[in-house]
Amino acid sequence: MSLSRLYSKKTQSSYNATAPLDRDPPEYPGDAFKKSRNKPTLTRPKSNLSLDDARCMIKGQIQNGSVDIELAKHYLILVLEQITEDNSDDWTSFGVQILSRTERGRPLCMVNIQLDDKDKTFDSQVKDSTATVEDDLWMTTYLLAIYRIGRATNKNYQTQLIDELNKLLATFPGDYVPMVQALQAFDSWPNDPNYCKLVACVDMFFSRFKKSKWAILRFGTISSRYRDCAALTALNHFSRLLGVDLVDALEWSFVGRVSDEIEQMLKPDQELDKVDSYTPYMIDLGISKASPYSTVRNPAWHLFCHTVGSLMMSRRSINARHLEAPDQSNILSNAELIVFVFETRIKWLKNFRKLDSVDASDQLDQVAPVVLGTKDLPNTTNADDWFSWMKLNNFELPDECGRYVSKLAKKLKDSREGSVGQFVYLRLGD
């Protein structure tokens, strides 16, 4: 593609109008598997430490308030290798066979495991010899929950998760130790690549084998699914906000930058509609280093979707983090129109009637619609109707729209600092 050139009238010189890229290009999961049809690789600590000894050391370290992450990974792998589940179906993703129908399911079946280069010796001074196999469920849940709690950026939410975890651990067999706040592991463990791969394996496996007693481990791993994919998951959110299917919802994208990002997310052959795909775990499994589905990659779509949601009083949208986006004024105007249309154009169906009776309202279905002039607002929620009207009226929002949306935006006055809700209030309601 040829680049536009900038011409200086003053110096009569021309220049390439280029700016440095501020981030690496996105990496799609499908592209990674085109290069190699192999499972992702998990590196485990190289140690002969038995499960019995590792169990006692882990319990002792949990009681002591400081757990060696290498020991934790070694112990988790030893426990997970003991778990098997009945399986009767082939499991494939991007042409990679994860399980065949003749194999029993194992939590680490989606990765190839290799040993670390160096032997690992663990400090055995801190141990609890009372640890038994009964402790495995609560200890694995505890160790995996460090991922979810550590990734929580809001301290109040982090405290809430710890409270929920401790209530859960109290229901398990064994002599559990409650988690406390301010563990050093919260900061470091979610940044360890192989710990994150373990977390992803557990969540991916028990997302498929939901009836297993070990599926409770997903309490701590659930946030690995669709990590750095918030813009992608917002597609369903947007569709639900409007109450229409996704195709009809996306027809309302009238801003070029928003539409570009939607196309980026909907690139084909990425298994977006396959629930047991590698795609939701592409970040933690190391398949992609730069998600094409993150809010950072799709700031225009993020603002568009959550401006609509904020004006519709969706708590998820109101609290969404505000990111600087290109063409914000056009995005806000597009969102204003959508909210005005979908909140003032009611679409109902009379779904029931008395048996053997006739509804008079059914006869109205045969009445031809009135053709509107350029000043008459469409009575539909059809995107093409409204785009045509806007085009005929020089893309100026109706006065009724501005007044209606302003009232809604004023309700967002107390939104969280740095949120989309606060941004919408300051731009449209203040």
From Swiss-Prot:
What superkingdom heads the lineage? Answer: Viruses
Extract the ranges annotated as region (Disordered): 1-48
| Keyword Nucleotide-binding recorded | no
Paired cysteines (S-S):
none
Question: Where along the chain is composition biased (Polar residues)?
Answer: 1-17, 39-48
Output the Gene Ontology cellular-component terms.
Answer: helical viral capsid; host cell cytoplasm; ribonucleoprotein complex; viral nucleocapsid
Subcellular location(s): the record lists:
Virion; Host cytoplasm
A molecular function (GO) held by this record is: RNA binding
The UniProt keyword set, sorted, is: Capsid protein, Helical capsid protein, Host cytoplasm, Ribonucleoprotein, RNA-binding, Viral nucleoprotein, Viral RNA replication, Virion
Q: What the protein does? A: Encapsidates the genome, protecting it from nucleases. The encapsidated genomic RNA is termed the NC and serves as template for transcription and replication. Nucleocapsid assembly is concomitant with replication, therefore viral replication depends on the intracellular concentration of free N, termed N(0). All replicative products are resistant to nucleases.
> Self-association or partners: how does it assemble?
Homomultimerizes to form the nucleocapsid. Binds to viral genomic RNA. N in nucleocapsid binds the P protein and thereby positions the polymerase on the template. Interaction of N(0) with the P protein prevents the uncontrolled aggregation of N(0).
Q: Please state what the protein is called.
A: Nucleoprotein
Species this chain originates from: Tupaia virus (isolate Tupaia/Thailand/-/1986) (TUPV)
